[in-house]
């Protein structure tokens, strides 16, 4: 799998065998927490689609997911994500089903129905405690 940082607010995930790599379009670009969130969303979507394709006996070697996002304020955060599924070999009559399958990604569902967050400050460990 290869994650490519396309811009400060866009990534691309390509499937494939071998180790996962993270690449950038330029040396100045760094893998930000926003890229990480989008990578999780794209990887989950790619995984769900690959599993469906295997089950349906469809080739998925050319499947890729791009995720873009934009920010909103008060407070500053990601306001929306746009997922673009690129799958040139997918037959036209399977596109609607593939889109439904993509919507089953657990990461996407978690974002749509956010969990409760709890932040705790833990006490420092006692000196000499083992």
Give residue spans per PLM region.
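Extended beta-strand/beta-hairpin segments
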Residues: 1-39, 49-130
């Amino acid at each position: 799998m290869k994650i490519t940082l396309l811009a400060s607010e866009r990534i691309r995930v390509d499937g494939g065998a071998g180790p996962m790599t993270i690449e950038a379009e330029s040396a100045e670009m760094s893998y930000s927490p926003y890229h990480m969130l989008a990578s999780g969303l794209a990887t989950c979507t790619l995984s769900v689609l690959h599993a469906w394709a295997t089950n349906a006996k469809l080739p998925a070697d050319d499947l890729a997911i791009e995720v873009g996002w934009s920010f909103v304020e008060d407070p500053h955060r990601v306001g929306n994500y746009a997922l673009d599924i690129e799958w040139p070999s997918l037959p036209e009559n399977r596109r609607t089903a593939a889109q439904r399958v993509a919507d089953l990604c657990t990461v996407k569902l978690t974002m749509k129905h956010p969990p409760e967050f709890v932040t705790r400050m833990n006490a420092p460990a006692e000196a000499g405690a083992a």
